[in-house]
């Protein structure tokens, strides 16, 4: 055993360095959050609860093109299109998402040409029954109305990367 190793063991260098390291972290602010009361930041690309958006005049955006239904790998989306209107457009009569099947891949949002179906910022939608996870058009539109400000802000932040 050489002299430097003996000196280090006598002076308890590892103990002292560990003690100062512990003291440094002891007085730092805690990195954890008190979750139900504090929420961390969410990325603009976060994929949470689905929502159907409306135009500013209140008309729903969905044009019943059924691209989201076709691209969904889990086959969680069911759409029934209504008859064509006088102006040539059509809207959905039925728009259902089975959230039990959904894998939150975001392909429906990417496929939508008018940004009608989006995945919003809400990640707290636990339910007591499976039936509550079958979203119909009214529930999706209500989600869109509730989260419109956050959704439009996230889409604007993500626009340069699309």
From Swiss-Prot:
GO terms for cellular component: plasma membrane. NDH-1 shuttles electrons from NADH, via FMN and iron-sulfur (Fe-S) centers, to quinones in the respiratory chain. The immediate electron acceptor for the enzyme in this species is believed to be ubiquinone. Couples the redox reaction to proton translocation (for every two electrons transferred, four hydrogen ions are translocated across the cytoplasmic membrane), and thus conserves the redox energy in a proton gradient. One of its GO terms (biological process) is aerobic respiration. Binds 2 [4Fe-4S] clusters per subunit. Its cofactor is [4Fe-4S] cluster. It catalyses: a quinone + NADH + 5 H(+)(in) = a quinol + NAD(+) + 4 H(+)(out). The lineage of its organism: Bacteria, Pseudomonadati, Pseudomonadota, Alphaproteobacteria, Hyphomicrobiales. This is NADH-quinone oxidoreductase subunit I. It comes from the Bacteria. The keyword Methyltransferase does not apply. Belongs to the complex I 23 kDa subunit family. Pfam families: Fer4_7.
């Amino acid at each position: 055993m050489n002299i430097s190793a003996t000196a280090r063991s006598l002076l308890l260098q590892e103990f002292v360095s560990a003690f100062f390291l512990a003291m440094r972290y002891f007085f730092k602010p805690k990195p954890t959050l008190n979750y139900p009361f504090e929420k961390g930041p969410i990325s603009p690309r976060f994929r949470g609860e689905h929502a159907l958006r409306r135009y500013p005049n209140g008309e729903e955006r969905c044009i019943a093109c059924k691209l989201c239904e076709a691209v969904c790998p889990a086959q969680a989306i069911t759409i029934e299109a209504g008859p064509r209107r006088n102006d040539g457009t059509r809207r959905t009569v039925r728009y259902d998402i089975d959230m039990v099947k959904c894998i939150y891949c975001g392909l429906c949002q990417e496929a939508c040409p008018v940004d009608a179906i989006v995945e919003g910022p809400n990640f707290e939608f636990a339910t007591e029954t499976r039936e509550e996870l079958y979203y119909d058009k009214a529930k999706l539109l209500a989600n869109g109305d509730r989260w419109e400000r956050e959704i439009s802000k996230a889409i604007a932040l993500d626009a340069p990367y699309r």
